[in-house]
Amino acid sequence: MVFLNSSPFKGRLLFFVYLLIISTRLVAADMNTQYGCYLVDSSLTEQGTFTYLDPAYCYNNICGGSDNIAFVAIRNNQCYCGSTLTATEVSSSLCTTPCPGYGSLMCGGDLYWSVYLTGNGVLQTTVSSSSVSSTTSSSSSSSPSSSSTTTTTSPSSSSSSSSSSSSSSSSSSSSSSSSSSSSSSSSSSSSSSSSSSSSSSSSSSSSVPITSSTSSSHSSSSSSSSSSSSSSRPSSSSSFITTMSSSTFISTVTVTPSSSSSSTSSEVPSSTAALALNASKASNHTSLNAGAIVGIVIGCVAFAVVMALCIFLYFYFRRFKIRMSDSANEGKYPSYASELDSRLDPAMMNRKSSESLADSQDYSRKILRVTNLN
């Protein structure tokens, strides 16, 4: 004890703890490793786009580098960020689109997000109350008879029994309602009784206003009782942490309160409609880009063909005119015809006094020239 209380040992211990915290923070803040691949839904809002996008640029420049941001999600060149992740995780092999300019990093795909942790804030995963009820029912029906399940859910403003409880007879339904209301009143009367009930069912949960515990002695009865148990007291909290445990499975789930829990079996999650909408938008976006590229290529080819045709016609008609002019000049006398001997044309012959008279009978004879003998 004296050694532990010594000042040098305390200083070294604090220094070691400080180094451990710093190294953990640095490892957590490494955004070069993909945390997971998730299906695109409407839970996140696009913050911006960039041609050469990577996780660090998305966090620092587009999302502002806030300490409350726990993760960034990238879809092609679109940046998303937040602290609560509600999307469905899928296989990492579906996020195969490399980041532009960063071939070693993946940037999701047309319908998938690549999620990277920033090392700040607290990463939370949330599901709806109906999803937790259905998960509880399915896990109870598949678990052995000795297992038990404790589910902590947030109270909703209006609640009714689900499809499994409504399909039972009216007498069993009323008895189930009375038993659940008595359980609710007993759990709300004292927090110690609810905590003891939670510990006896071999499950641990965080402190919340209302806790409902269900033991599965048989698969069908466990499913009906777990799906029919609900609370009606309103709460101001927006989310609750639930821990479900069995002999081999432990999971922590944050439950989001829903406005109404009636007819949960016929309720369609909003993420499905959002997924279909995003898929149609992505297909339209891809088809528009492909159509624009094809149109540009066809336009360039057509312009080149028209220009080549115009050049060909120009030279063709030019040679045609030359040939036509040559053929038109073939029947005419040559231009040098007027340069012949004028004696062959008496009308054009010049009559000079110094020359002899022209012989109009025979042009083949020599023309005598008169000379002065004196």
Curated annotation (Swiss-Prot):
Residues 31-119 form the WSC domain. The chain crosses the membrane at residues 293-313. Glycans are attached at N278, N284. Keywords: Glycoprotein, Membrane, Phosphoprotein, Signal, Transmembrane, Transmembrane helix. InterPro entries: Kremen_rcpt, WSC_carb-bd. O-mannosylated. PANTHER family: KREMEN PROTEIN (PTHR24269), PROTEIN SLG1 (PTHR24269:SF16). It is found in: Membrane. The keyword Lyase does not apply. GO terms for molecular function: mechanoreceptor activity. The keyword Signal applies. Residues 30-292 are extracellular. The modification Phosphoserine is found at S354. Its main location: membrane. SMART domains: WSC (SM00321). Residues 314-374 are cytoplasmic. It is a single-pass membrane protein. GO terms for cellular component: plasma membrane; plasma membrane of cell tip. One of its GO terms (biological process) is intracellular signal transduction. This is Cell wall integrity and stress response component 1. Residues 1-29 form the signal peptide. It comes from the Eukaryota. It holds the Pfam family WSC. It comes from Schizosaccharomyces pombe (strain 972 / ATCC 24843) (Fission yeast). Residues 132-236 are annotated as: Disordered.
